[in-house]
């Protein structure tokens, strides 16, 4: 595995692969890798001739009161995991390489509407930072496909929208969420949970499932959400939001929509956990 922080090195390798008619898959990450990330790499290997992974803790997507400085940086362990998984190039740029003019002078990309709702409402500017870094990494790596976990469902939809709106020749693929045995979605931020909190954390998935089951039984959506919030509060969570949206657009649900997603975020101790469950309005 080649590890580099140089944009020119990435481009040289991609140019060589392209000259042979070979395809490139890209998995962007912020490091502190878990099995969910490795699943993305494994899926990338199935879909393309070459796999590039990036590790970059992106300062643009953190607000002033968030955990940029405390975000876990585990490059040695991450590198070992990626090498074992068969990654060919690991791209590890510094903020100075990505944002040479500094954040204040950086051109940015903003996806309207869906970038301002849900997690975007709780974390102003977050998805502007996400869209900007992903667009920049796409320009550097120039992949045929890029893979993202469906756990970050809103992020996935925003990136798909950006790629479509800007006519980027990249196939964005969402990969199913990898979960702990308890049902808790794997996340780098699970490391913020105490042992006791980790036992309670699976309640978020249970709350989302309860909304799905209630809607499929014909119950009112708002009542299902209210009941689920009570379940979270009892388990020690502070709910941020729980909502049901169109699973294909992330827009508000209309009577005609059948493919839905229940999406939520809640605080547990020092961690802000997110999760989602896609479902059909009427159970089969």
Curated annotation (Swiss-Prot):
Binding positions for ATP per the UniProt entry: 30-37, 149-152, 178, 186-189
Protein encoded by which gene: panC
Oligomer status and interactors: Homodimer.
KW Nucleotide-binding (keyword) present: yes
Main location: cytoplasm
Residues involved in (R)-pantoate binding: 61, 155
Compartment(s) of residence: Cytoplasm
Note: The reaction proceeds by a bi uni uni bi ping pong mechanism.
Organism whose genome encodes this protein: Shewanella frigidimarina (strain NCIMB 400)
Similarity comment: Belongs to the pantothenate synthetase family.
Name of the molecule in the record: Pantothenate synthetase
This enzyme's EC code(s): 6.3.2.1
Binding positions (beta-alanine): 61
Cellular compartments per GO CC: cytosol
GO process annotations (BP): pantothenate biosynthetic process
CDD domains: PanC
Active site location: 37
Pfam families: Pantoate_ligase
């Amino acid at each position: 595995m080649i590890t580099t922080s140089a944009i020119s090195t990435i481009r040289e390798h991609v140019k060589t692969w392209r000259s042979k008619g070979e395809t490139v898959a890209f998995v962007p990450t912020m490091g502190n890798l878990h099995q969910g990330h490795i699943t993305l790499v494994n899926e990338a290997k199935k879909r393309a001739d070459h796999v590039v992974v990036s590790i970059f803790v992106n300062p643009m997507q953190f607000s002033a009161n968030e955990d940029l400085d405390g975000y876990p940086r585990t490059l040695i362990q991450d590198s070992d995991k990626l090498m074992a998984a068969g990654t060919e190039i690991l791209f590890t740029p510094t903020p100075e390489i990505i944002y040479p003019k500094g954040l204040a002078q950086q051109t940015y990309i903003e996806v309207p509407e869906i970038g301002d709702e849900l997690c975007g409402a709780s974390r102003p500017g977050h998805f502007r930072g996400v869209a900007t870094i992903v667009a920049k990494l796409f320009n550097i790596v120039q992949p045929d496909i890029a893979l993202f976990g469906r756990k970050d469902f809103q992020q996935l939809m925003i990136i798909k929208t950006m790629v479509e709106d800007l006519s980027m020749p990249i196939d964005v693929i969402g990969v199913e969420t990898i979960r702990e045995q308890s049902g808790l979605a794997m996340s780098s931020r699970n490391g913020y949970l105490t042992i006791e909190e980790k036992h309670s954390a699976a309640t978020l998935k249970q709350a989302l499932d309860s909304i799905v089951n209630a809607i499929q039984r014909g119950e009112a959506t708002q009542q299902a959400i209210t009941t689920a919030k009570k379940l979270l509060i009892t388990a020690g969570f502070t709910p941020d939001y729980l909502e049901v949206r169109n699973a294909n657009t992330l827009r508000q649900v209309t009577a005609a929509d059948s493919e839905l997603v229940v999406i939520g975020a809640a605080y547990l101790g020092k961690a802000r956990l997110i999760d989602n469950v896609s479902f059909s309005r009427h159970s089969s």
